[in-house]
């Protein structure tokens, strides 16, 4: 007999990204919707059977999605804005894709829903829009269909839902500054969830998992009452036939645990990775309701390192001192880790044994559950426990003394750039001689099949390095020529040689490991393959200098060097767990600093250091923002560029994030120019820029590159005027909101032509 095991969620893209490939083929018209549905059904069955074979008791269903689970929840509740309903698609999947990607075709022209980061992960969710026209009602059978689908295979699953509290807190009203949680809205949402719970009870469901990750955030006035009022209406629908697990993750719920414990949930899921100390203290202080099971989230759903069984067992034992009702669970959905280490033969066995991807985490979960109920003698005799402990005894990788020496020699002066920004801006305007409202792009240009094929040929040894370089130079030449023709002011080389903005740098730094197939979903069908920080990081040789110098030699325009910043490299990698994030970021900062100075020596006058993921790992509770993150993340960025000349213009770029609350910290990065991804956020960041007297020049994105639609010149011109209402014209740059790598040339160049034309039109009007 072992403790009950529960998986919060499982990756849905497939071991070989089957879901991504079939959906993208459908978007291109190369397959049918029936084929998409068939592939999805095969994947669901495979994933359920894998979990069943691993001995998992509570296997999730309804964790699958074609695009995003928040989007699925919006559709479940009929939270579908009128602009999408008017498209009148025959198939619900088409409506879902239009909401996620936008639509431009014979049925109309609509933008996508806003997209934001899912808490502190690199996953993105679609933001539901609730307005006066929204008619909340049960609108989908997806959760029930997938439960029945698994049941037909002989597997009784645990349906998973995003909870009503989290859904409402993440939704927005596009017609108002804030969503009003009025009684009518709250009752309508609660009624749908109660109806869902009742239907599950009729179907013979034993457990329902309702995810409420928003509970781990700071509470605003009224939040606790909102939560209580929702569940006061939902929980009675159980009627004693079905159990409800309230699942929380990405932090602790110590401030509301007492309330949650008294509401009568059958299970409470606690994250014992990120919220370990606070959650344990709350359980010890307030106890556990008699009929409630605590689901101990001990298997990390956010990183790829092996679980330390001794630590996990200690956490389970601590809970057992309070209650006998303890289940063992993943700390969060396994959506955020790759599928399996199987097939990663590029990693040596003595390296690979330190990693656990989703499939391996199933085995870890089962083994921890068995050991949790074992006697002391059985634990001592356990080969699994001994083998696991051996992974953590001794030193995994030797430290690099040169890296340690360099960090120890840093002084306060290394983190401060001279002269002050206002003086630098004067010198840069004179040196660069750019027009008002200068136009540029964020860095990458579309990577065609031919570009990807050429990289693959080099990797397989089918072409020489010289042949590869010649091909890439031709790509750069064509990209530069096209940028010159449409009239962009600051050019880029296109980044054709880069597979990924993080992996590319990792491949050229000491201390990283790489996988063949460790893909994770970022948004929609977009997947990323993060590198692994294995040891101390340093730069062996220049990385980008040759390409940037070549590009500058091919044009009289200003050429922008393109780098990825240290915080983003760490946040979009699998970080080490044996040293702190601060230590790893400082190592990365010194490596990128060397590259910045070499670019400057090579004649590159504008250098962009992307910190796309800076906001991503900001702690969810404000009291932790500075002491646990910003106090070392911001100085790390300054360390990268502090030694350049005053005339060298330092740019940075930030992706899907909410910046308003840390705008002063962003200004403190001391960059000369920053581009924000802002087009899907309705430019709300402009108010923060205005109110904070933001000193950095800025380019809020004027169109959304994550949608295939082409913005008109007038649309972009209107956007520019919106920006100018809040910003000094001399501090405004005009750019798309992100890199163009994942777009096609067919939409990229017309969009940029409209961008340049709009900027010129505004300049002309301002000159009158």
From Swiss-Prot:
Gene3D superfamilies: 3.20.20.210
Binding, 5-methyltetrahydropteroyltri-L-glutamate: 17-20, 117, 526-527, 572, 616
Its EC number(s): 2.1.1.14
Residues involved in L-homocysteine binding: 442-444, 495, 610
Keyword Repeat (UniProt): yes
Keyword Transport in annotation: no
Domain of life: Bacteria
Single biological process term from Gene Ontology: methionine biosynthetic process
A GO MF term: 5-methyltetrahydropteroyltriglutamate-homocysteine S-methyltransferase activity
Biological function: Catalyzes the transfer of a methyl group from 5-methyltetrahydrofolate to homocysteine resulting in methionine formation.
HAMAP family reported for this sequence: Meth_synth (MF_00172)
Family: Belongs to the vitamin-B12 independent methionine synthase family.
Protein name as annotated: 5-methyltetrahydropteroyltriglutamate--homocysteine methyltransferase
Organism: Bifidobacterium adolescentis (strain ATCC 15703 / DSM 20083 / NCTC 11814 / E194a)
């Amino acid at each position: 007999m072992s403790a009950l095991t529960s998986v919060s969620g499982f990756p849905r893209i497939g071991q070989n990204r089957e879901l991504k490939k079939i959906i993208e083929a459908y978007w291109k018209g190369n397959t049918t919707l029936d084929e998409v549905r068939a592939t999805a059904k095969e994947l669901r069955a495979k994933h359920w059977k894998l979990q069943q074979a691993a001995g998992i008791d509570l296997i999730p269903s309804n964790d699958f999605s074609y695009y995003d689970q928040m989007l699925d929840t919006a559709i479940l509740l009929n939270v579908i804005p009128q602009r999408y309903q008017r498209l009148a698609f025959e198939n619900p999947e088409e409506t879902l894709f239009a909401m996620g990607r936008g639509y431009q075709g014979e049925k109309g022209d609509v933008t996508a829903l806003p997209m934001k980061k899912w808490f502190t992960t690199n996953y993105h969710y679609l933001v539901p829009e609730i307005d006066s026209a929204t008619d909340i009602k049960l609108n989908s059978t997806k959760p029930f269909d997938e439960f029945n689908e698994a049941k037909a295979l002989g597997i009784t699953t645990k349906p998973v839902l995003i909870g009503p509290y989290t859904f409402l807190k993440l939704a927005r009203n596009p017609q108002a500054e804030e969503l009003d949680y009025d009684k009518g809205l709250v009752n309508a949402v609660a009624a749908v969830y109660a109806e869902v719970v009742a239907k599950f009870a009729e179907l013979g469901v034993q457990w329902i998992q309702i995810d409420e990750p928003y509970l781990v955030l700071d509470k605003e006035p009224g939040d606790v009452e909102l939560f209580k009022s929702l569940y006061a209406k939902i929980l009675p629908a159980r009627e004693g036939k079905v159990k409800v697990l309230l699942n929380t993750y990405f932090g602790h719920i110590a401030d509301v645990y007492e309330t949650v414990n008294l509401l009568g949930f059958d299970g409470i899921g606690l994250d014992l990775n990120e919220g370990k100390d606070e959650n344990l203290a709350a359980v010890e202080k307030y106890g556990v309701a008699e009929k409630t099971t605590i689901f101990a989230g001990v298997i990390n759903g956010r990183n790829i390192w092996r679980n330390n069984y001794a630590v996990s067992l200690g956490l389970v034992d601590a809970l057992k001192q309070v209650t006998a009702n303890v289940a063992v669970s993943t700390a969060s959905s396994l959506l955020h880790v790759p599928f399996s280490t199987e097939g990663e033969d590029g990693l040596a066995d003595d390296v690979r044994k330190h990693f656990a991807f989703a499939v391996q985490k199933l085995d870890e979960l089962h083994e921890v559950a068995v050991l949790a109920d074992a006697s002391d003698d059985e634990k001592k005799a356990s080969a699994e426990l001994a083998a696991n402990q051996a992974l953590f005894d001794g030193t995994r990788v030797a430290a690099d003394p040169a890296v340690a020496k360099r960090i120890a020699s840093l002084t306060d002066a290394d983190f401060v750039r001279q002269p002050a920004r206002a003086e630098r801006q004067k010198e840069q305007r004179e040196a660069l001689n750019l027009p008002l409202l200068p136009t540029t792009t964020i860095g990458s240009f579309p990577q065609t099949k031919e570009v990807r094929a050429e990289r693959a040929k080099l990797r397989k040894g089918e072409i020489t390095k010289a042949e590869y370089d010649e091909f890439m130079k031709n790509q750069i030449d064509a990209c530069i020529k096209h940028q010159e023709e449409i009239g962009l002011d600051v050019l880029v080389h296109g980044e054709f040689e880069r597979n990924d903005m993080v992996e590319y740098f990792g491949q050229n730094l000491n201390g990283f490991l790489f996988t063949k197939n460790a893909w994770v979903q970022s948004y929609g069908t977009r997947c990323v393959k993060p590198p692994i920080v294995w040891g101390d990081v340093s730069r062996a040789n220049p990385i980008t200098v040759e390409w940037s110098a070549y590009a500058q030699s091919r044009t009289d325009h200003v050429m922008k060097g393109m780098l990825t910043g240290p915080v983003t490299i760490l946040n979009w990698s699998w970080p080490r767990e044996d040293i702190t994030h601060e230590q790893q970021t400082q190592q990365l900062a010194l490596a990128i600093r060397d590259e910045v100075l070499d670019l400057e020596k090579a004649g590159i006058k504008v250098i962009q250091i992307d910190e796309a993921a800076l906001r991503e790992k900001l702690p969810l509770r404000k009291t932790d923002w500075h002491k646990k993150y910003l106090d070392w993340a911001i100085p790390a960025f300054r360390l990268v560029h502090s030694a350049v000349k005053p005339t060298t213009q330092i740019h940075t770029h930030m992706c899907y994030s909410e910046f308003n609350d840390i705008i002063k910290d962003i200004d403190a990065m001391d960059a000369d120019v920053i581009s924000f991804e802002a087009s899907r956020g309705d430019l709300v960041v402009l108010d923060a820029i205005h109110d904070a007297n933001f000193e950095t020049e800025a380019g809020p994105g004027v169109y959304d590159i994550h949608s295939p639609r082409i913005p008109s010149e007038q649309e972009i011109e209107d956007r520019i005027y919106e920006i100018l209402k809040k910003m000094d014209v001399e501090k405004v740059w005009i750019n798309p909101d992100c890199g163009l790598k994942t777009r096609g040339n067919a939409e990229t160049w017309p969009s940029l032509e409209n961008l340049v034309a709009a900027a010129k039109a505004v300049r002309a009007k301002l000159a009158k």
